[in-house]
Amino acid sequence: MGGISIWQLLIIALIVVLLFGTKKLRSLGGDLGGAVKGFKNAMSSEEDKKALEDTEAAKTAQTTQQATEKKPESNKEQA
C-alpha cells in the first residue's frame, strides 16, 4: 500500500518514451552523462591541486626547518 510497483514504473517509463522519443532521451542522457563526467573531473582536479599544494607546503616547511637547524652550527664554527 502506497508503494510503487515494478509495473507502475514500467508504465511510467513507456509513457516518457512515447512523449519524448528515443532520440531526445538519448541526447538528454548523453548531456547528463557529460555533466556528471565534467563534475567528477572538476572534483578530482581540485583534490589534485590541494594535494599538490599540501606537498609543496610540506617541502617548504622541511627546507625551512633544515635551514634553521644548520644556522646554529655555522655560528659555533665562527666563534
Swiss-Prot record:
Residues passing through the membrane, by range: 1-21
An annotated GO BP: protein transport by the Tat complex
GO molecular function: protein transmembrane transporter activity
Record localization: Cell inner membrane
Keyword tags: Cell inner membrane, Cell membrane, Membrane, Protein transport, Translocation, Transmembrane, Transmembrane helix, Transport
Residue ranges, compositional bias (Basic and acidic residues): 46-57, 68-79
Record function comment: Part of the twin-arginine translocation (Tat) system that transports large folded proteins containing a characteristic twin-arginine motif in their signal peptide across membranes. TatA could form the protein-conducting channel of the Tat system.
UniProt-recorded name of the protein: Sec-independent protein translocase protein TatA
